[in-house]
């Protein structure tokens, strides 16, 4: 399983944009912008290692993600009436299948559940 989560502000600044990545080998990385980006660039901060999940923890997380129901969501959940706010993106690969999901100014419960799982991983790693 691999996963990358991105939270991108819909404001004219990239400060505060944040992302979490879990690699197939269990390596967990994080990035949060604390300085302004170059024009038309989303990220000013590099990936930083946050820790590593062992095979059992990665398998458990994979099953927890599946159990949220996120893989059954429509690819995009967007509130077209909102201005500003936040766009969240998630790329998930489990076995041979890849999923790209977007939630913009809306909180589908399965999407939110996976974000909570990711922050739980970060907390457990002492980040």
Region roles according to the model:
Residues 1-12, 17-18, 56-127:
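Short, well-ordered, aromatic-rich surface patches in folded extracellular/luminal domains
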Residues 18-22, 48-51, 90:
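Hydrophobic/aromatic beta-strand elements that line small-molecule binding cavities or substrate pockets
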Residues 24-28:
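Structural signal for glycine-centered tight turns and loop->strand junctions in beta-sheet-rich domains
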Residues 29-31, 44, 77:
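Generic serine detector
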Residues 31-33, 104:
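Surface loops and adjacent helix of pleckstrin homology
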Residues 33-72:
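A short-motif feature that recognizes glycine-rich, charge-decorated loops
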